[in-house]
Amino acid sequence: MKLTKLLTYLKNVPSYAGQEDPDITSIEMDSREVKTGSLFVCIKGYTVDGHDYARQAAEKGAAAIVAEREVDADVPVIIIRHTKRALAVLSDAFYGQPTKQLRLIGITGTNGKTSTSHMVEEIFRKAGSRTGLIGTMYTKIHDETFEAKNTTPESVTLQKTFRKMVDQGVDTAVMEVSSHALHMGRVHGCDYDIAAFTNLTQDHLDYHETMEEYKHAKSLLFSQLGGSFNHETPKWAVLNADDPASAYFAQVTSAHLLTYGIQNDADVMAENIKMAPKGTTFDLVTPKGSAQVTIPLVGLFNVYNVLTAAAIAIAADIPFATITEGIEGLKGVRGRFELVDAGQDFPVIVDYAHTPDSLENVLNTCRGLTEGKLFVVVGCGGDRDKTKRPKMAKIAVDLADEPVFTADNPRSENPLAILNDMEEGVKGAYYHSIVNREQAIFFAIANAKKGDVVLIAGKGHETYQQIGGQTFDFDDAEVAKRAILELK
């Protein structure tokens, strides 16, 4: 695509009057990826500023540079105000606006995004769709998976992925949309058909600073959804009637609304919920019909996830029989209330719970399965929201019999300092503090017996531990299996 043609998609940029009008062969934000003909977009990040690498990009063959200020480079430089947003728009245009050729479903919220997105994908596959998935665990194009670096990739990677999906015949893409991605403009230019909200509880306050700012970031998914009446296919906002933030999201969107819930009246509801150690049965009540469904998942949070997925499917006009069939065929997601079975006579559960709300929910669910003592191994991430540390500790102490505090990706922080922050919330309480995560897991499993439950919280599907700028292999489920086998 010619540079002048590409720049027409940036409506707030002065018309490009350079003598050169090169063919753009790729769009890059990392100077190391630049090749002959690339358009290099300078992005100022947390630790690195792309403007400092403009000359390097030009020397590697960049045809032009988009920047927020003057840079030292012997190629055309286009100055604009917001390069992050520009990167999203330019990437969308360069790859042929692929989301306009997909049914795009975005799911945002503090907890439940990963499980819900997998449920949605399963229902749509049952309906005959060829699906794509973008999320915390991986990116998936039909049956092929790729490692994910962020919950929501950078905009240029995102649009490139959508292009691959379209080229490989995908018709429906489901993606987790993080508050960071919304605030940074990574999804600017994505043409969503359905946007869904799971819940809003404390997380990422190291980045957003206040819950109001966090809520506003989430609301951007709904405010940019567009008007329902300007499209052949209506746009839908799917909202949790039991979460107070939904009222705000309903105000900022002009899309059609579809609600779900358990406590408050909603379009899609779960009634007569019955939980057992290995599954949950409830009545699914929707505008398309009602049916009793059984899922091999436990916990009220999983019922909410199913309701979100069902509401999304209804918004997409999937037949009710297909929705219930998809729900009945659901499987657990790795690291989400994952049962570890190595022949022991007590449940060991690995879960991604890393926020106060998610930890409380999963501990309450575990309590329902516990006849004896409830053990929880829990830590808090380094270089992240410090205010949730004492709250997480208090929840662990209040809801578990044997809380074990430990390290969970301390990153650049001293793990002992993180444990001290946690302990500030539980002075005088009973708990164990074992900084080495492997030793903490071994301790909990060594002391558990029949009738007890061991919950290992925080890392879920992650297979690494980040300590002091280094990344080490670490898998909670694998460590738990090893502990069970060695301690038999």
Swiss-Prot record:
Name of the featured protein: UDP-N-acetylmuramoyl-L-alanyl-D-glutamate--2,6-diaminopimelate ligase
Sites where the protein binds meso-2,6-diaminopimelate: 384, 408-411, 458, 462
Entry comment on modification after translation: Carboxylation is probably crucial for Mg(2+) binding and, consequently, for the gamma-phosphate positioning of ATP.
Pfam families in UniProt: Mur_ligase, Mur_ligase_C, Mur_ligase_M
Modified positions (N6-carboxylysine) in chain numbering: 218
Keywords assigned: ATP-binding, Cell cycle, Cell division, Cell shape, Cell wall biogenesis/degradation, Cytoplasm, Ligase, Magnesium, Nucleotide-binding, Peptidoglycan synthesis
Reactions the enzyme catalyzes: UDP-N-acetyl-alpha-D-muramoyl-L-alanyl-D-glutamate + meso-2,6-diaminopimelate + ATP = UDP-N-acetyl-alpha-D-muramoyl-L-alanyl-gamma-D-glutamyl-meso-2,6-diaminopimelate + ADP + phosphate + H(+)
Record-linked PANTHER family: MUR LIGASE FAMILY MEMBER, UDP-N-ACETYLMURAMOYL-L-ALANYL-D-GLUTAMATE--2,6-DIAMINOPIMELATE LIGASE MURE HOMOLOG, CHLOROPLASTIC
GO cellular-component term (any): cytoplasm
Motif (Meso-diaminopimelate recognition motif): 408-411
Subcellular localization: Cytoplasm
Family assignment from sequence similarity: Belongs to the MurCDEF family. MurE subfamily.
Pathway noted in the entry: Cell wall biogenesis; peptidoglycan biosynthesis
Cited function: Catalyzes the addition of meso-diaminopimelic acid to the nucleotide precursor UDP-N-acetylmuramoyl-L-alanyl-D-glutamate (UMAG) in the biosynthesis of bacterial cell-wall peptidoglycan.
Protein's UniProt keywords contain Iron-sulfur: no
GO MF annotations, alphabetized: ATP binding; magnesium ion binding; UDP-N-acetylmuramoylalanyl-D-glutamate-2,6-diaminopimelate ligase activity
The protein's Enzyme Commission number: 6.3.2.13
Record: residues binding UDP-N-acetyl-alpha-D-muramoyl-L-alanyl-D-glutamate: 31, 150-152, 178, 186
